[in-house]
Amino acid sequence: PKDLIEEVFNELARRWVPIFNHYQDNGVDIGFELHPGEDLFDGATWEMFLDKVKGHKAAMINYDPSHFLLQQLDYLAFIDLYYDRINAFHVKDAEFNPNGRQGVYSGYQPWLNRAGRFRSLGDGQVDFKGIFSKLLEYGYNSWAVLEWECCIKSPEQGAAEGAPFIAGHIID
């Protein structure tokens, strides 16, 4: 129906603004992890939401480049646009290898067989040197948290490799 999306974002604002106000009164921000399949999943939906909540200062972004890579969104340009709203960073890798049978939506295949899938840090296609550099350029001084989901390696291997990977990318 006409105006359905507008109605949805108005309802999101109605529900979130009181929460933002309470959190702000207590010195806490909320970092939204923009994710495919959620109400907020890219810059356009973020801007629609931010407009409806009148730019509330407690509304922030938990930046996860793997979600943007799987959507084929320019995750480095995203930082340029929204750096002042990024308050957390999930260091998570992914790869996107489309073929003649599947693309972004991956045809309901198991993770191992999807065109887009999460990988251990350094095994995917995310440019972490570019991300860490760009965040530093904008004065980012907050969390860089390992989030791990890999369809090939074990969680133990992911953790053992992930911590030194992040440490090696942090710029002093």
What residues fall within each predicted segment?
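Active-site beta-loop-alpha junctions enriched in small/polar residues
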Residues: 33-37, 64-68, 92-94, 147-151
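Conserved, mostly hydrophobic/aromatic
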Residues: 30, 46, 64, 89, ...
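C-terminal helical cap(s) of enzyme catalytic domains, especially alpha/beta-barrels
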Residues: 155-172
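Short amphipathic alpha-helical/adjacent loop interface patches that line ligand
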Residues: 16, 86, 163
